[in-house]
């Protein structure tokens, strides 16, 4: 067995290297509680499921509570959402942030995945490249914000891009899923916004997902029964998946588990200032 990441899934799914999940004896009923998009990503061109994930990676807008209180008058997620409810409102709020001395995002690249997850069709159709209207809106909105110095053009994961994880970076928001919040925003580093529990989360202009890891069975494996057992335990056992949420603050690929955790008033995120963001 081996693991694949979302951006590289098709490289392996549409090959003979990956074994059909059904050939392991795993049924549609076994996977009934999983989010459909996690299946779609690892379904090959013939409609065959080739991998299973324990993760769901829906993304949210992650904002600085201190900046929200200073500029918007409130750090309540519902109030902040009003200022970022759609892209036109988002870009208008960027002007307000700039006047107050803050960048709306660290980079124009922060919003790309949100726009690109909301296109109406594939990049290549009938052998021709098709640029979706939502991609062009990202280009137009981003150029406007960069020209107005409301954001920058840093590469994701670069040192300059990461400066916004700290108060001196003067960045209002990032976009990301659960893994981004706890594992990528310097939560373990003294002085970071995450370490102080001063980020908040709200839906943002559009829903999106980012990343995820899938378990695949290698074609020809002589450990098929073991691979089946690992996949079923890791991706379908509600108790195990609930423990993953509680222990790691991850978002798991199990609808009943996530619905229960979203309604659990005892669950909260330290990084997000005690907020339970799972109902979004």
Model-inferred region functions:
Residues 25-30, 40-111, 123-156, 219-225:
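Helix-loop-helix "hinge/cap" segment bordering the ligand-binding cleft or interdomain interface
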Residues 12-16, 117, 243-246:
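Short, solvent-exposed loop/turn and secondary-structure capping segments
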Residues 9-11, 137-229:
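Extracytoplasmic/periplasmic substrate-binding proteins
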Residues 4, 63, 176, 222, ...:
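A conserved hydrophobic position in a structured secondary element of the catalytic/binding core
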Residues 4-60, 88-91, 194-203, 269-270:
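Hinge/lid segment of periplasmic solute-binding proteins
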Residues 6-11, 57-60, 67-68, 110-113, ...:
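Solvent-exposed loop/turn segments at secondary-structure junctions
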Residues 183-193, 205-280:
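C-terminal lobe and pocket-closing loops
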Residues 1-4, 17-19, 167-176:
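Alpha-to-beta junction loops
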């Amino acid at each position: 067995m081996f693991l694949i990441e979302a951006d590289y899934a098709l490289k392996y799914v549409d090959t003979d290297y990956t074994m059909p999940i059904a050939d392991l004896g795993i049924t549609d009923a076994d996977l009934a509680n999983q989010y459909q998009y996690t299946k779609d990503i690892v379904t090959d061109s013939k409609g065959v499921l080739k991998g299973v994930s324990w993760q769901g990676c829906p993304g949210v807008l992650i904002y600085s509570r201190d900046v929200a209180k200073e500029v918007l008058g409130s750090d309540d997620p519902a109030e902040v959402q009003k200022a970022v409810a759609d892209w036109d409102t988002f870009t208008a709020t960027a002007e307000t942030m700039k006047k107050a001395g803050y960048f709306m995002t660290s980079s124009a690249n922060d919003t790309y995945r949100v726009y690109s997850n909301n296109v109406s069709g594939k990049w290549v159709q009938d052998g021709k490249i098709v640029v979706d209207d939502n991609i062009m809106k990202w280009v137009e909105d981003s150029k406007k914000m960069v020209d107005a110095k409301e954001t920058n053009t840093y590469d994701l994961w670069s040192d300059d891009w990461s400066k916004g994880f700290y108060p001196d970076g003067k960045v209002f928001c990032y976009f990301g899923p659960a893994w981004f919040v706890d594992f990528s925003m310097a939560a373990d580093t003294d002085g970071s916004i995450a370490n102080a529990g001063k980020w908040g989360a709200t839906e943002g202009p559009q829903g999106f997902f980012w990343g995820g890891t899938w378990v695949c069975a290698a074609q020809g494996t002589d450990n098929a029964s073991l691979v089946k057992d690992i996949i079923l335990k890791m991706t379908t056992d509600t108790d195990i998946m609930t423990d993953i949420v509680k222990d790691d603050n991850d978002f798991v690929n199990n609808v009943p588990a996530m619905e229960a955790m979203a309604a659990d008033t005892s669950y909260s995120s330290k990084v997000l200032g005690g907020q339970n963001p799972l109902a979004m």
